[in-house]
């Protein structure tokens, strides 16, 4: 239940008094000329919005984590006192008209597991908008993520056309694992700003997203075991790979990352000189139009580091390698039939 409604005459007044408001309050920011009004249910943007792009679209749940409280409302959240209702696996929300909206918020009180997680179901055509952290702690959007918080959350939602935002810079193990796998209507991916990764954080995240044409930037320079494992596997419409700036690799970091990306023609530049176990294992497997690779590795002795990594690429192409590297030819080395160009590696003295 709400305890109070706080009225502020300006956004600056709201910000000055924000920390002193009672919890579970509604705040209305009112400009003097009433041209602007904003309502905040305890925290600004403490919800995500699903908008029907097709009449009769539905949203439900296939699974609900035992740690997950999930609430929804079809009321206008930009007016005081929207009524929030509890969401469970027996609830199906029908958006009768194109443009109808439903708002979700939640709290995840414990770490999920690979058998205890929340998964949405959808029909029709639906766009998501807003900070996905609002599903895990709508009262504190910058709260640390829980393990497996987004595990399979929208997997198989072929009706999802736009993903919610994922602004977290501190991740948790498996946090976005298979989160959007088989979302075949997604064409773009949300930004992923984290620069330090944790194990399996992006594993299979967009696996099977066959309409995805644009990958997010991947600024991370500190990798983790299986962090990008099969991240874009089967993304057959992906035409440009993101840059991979990390220079130190870890086990299975890029394993299967672009497996089956048949529209890729150019691999991301691979600057690390020392490979790690399974780091490029099946990385570019089945990329049938791929015809350009620049890989500057000089130590390729790690276990299965390049096993089948270029199996099924274009029969002709260009491979740029370090001048002092020793590669074999074939599906686990330099593709047969490709032109090889050697390049000096610049040594930076500290």
Labelled PLM ranges:
Residues 1-350:
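Solvent-exposed loop and capping/linker segments of extracellular ligand-binding repeat ectodomains
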């Amino acid at each position: 239940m709400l305890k109070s409604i706080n009225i502020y005459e300006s956004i600056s007044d709201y910000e000055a008094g924000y920390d002193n408001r009672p919890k579970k309050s509604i705040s209305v920011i009112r400009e003097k000329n009433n041209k602007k009004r904003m309502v905040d249910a305890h925290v600004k943007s403490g919800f995500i919005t699903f908008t029907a792009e097709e009449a009769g679209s539905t949203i439900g749940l296939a699974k609900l984590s035992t740690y997950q409280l999930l609430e929804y409302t079809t009321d206008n959240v930009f007016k005081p006192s929207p009524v929030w209702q509890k969401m469970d696996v027996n609830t199906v929300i029908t958006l009768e008209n194109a443009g109808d909206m439903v708002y979700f918020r939640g709290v995840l009180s414990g770490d999920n597991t690979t058998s205890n997680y929340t998964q949405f179901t959808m029909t029709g055509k639906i766009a998501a908008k807003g900070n996905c952290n609002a599903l895990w702690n709508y009262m504190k959007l910058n709260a640390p993520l829980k393990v497996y918080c987004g595990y399979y959350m929208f997997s198989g939602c072929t009706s999802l056309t736009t993903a919610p935002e994922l602004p977290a810079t501190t991740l948790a193990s498996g946090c976005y694992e298979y989160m959007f796998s088989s979302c075949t209507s997604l064409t773009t991916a949300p930004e992923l700003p984290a620069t330090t990764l944790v194990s399996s954080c992006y594993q299979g995240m967009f696996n099977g997203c066959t309409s995805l044409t644009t990958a997010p930037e991947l600024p991370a320079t500190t990798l983790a075991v299986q962090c990008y494992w099969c991240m874009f596997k089967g993304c057959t419409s992906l035409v440009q790979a993101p840059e991979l700036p990390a220079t130190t690799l870890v086990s299975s970091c890029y394993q299967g990352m672009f497996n089956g990306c048949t529209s890729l023609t150019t691999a991301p530049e691979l600057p690390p000189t020392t490979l790690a176990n399974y780091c490029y294992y099946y990385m570019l497997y089945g990329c049938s139009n791929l015809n350009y690779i620049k890989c500057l590795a000089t130590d390729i002795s790690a276990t299965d580091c390049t096993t089948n990594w270029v199996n099924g690429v274009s029969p002709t192409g260009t491979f740029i390698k370090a001048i002092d590297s020793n590669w074999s030819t074939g599906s686990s080395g330099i593709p047969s039939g490709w032109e090889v160009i050697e390049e000096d590696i610049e040594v930076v003295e500290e």
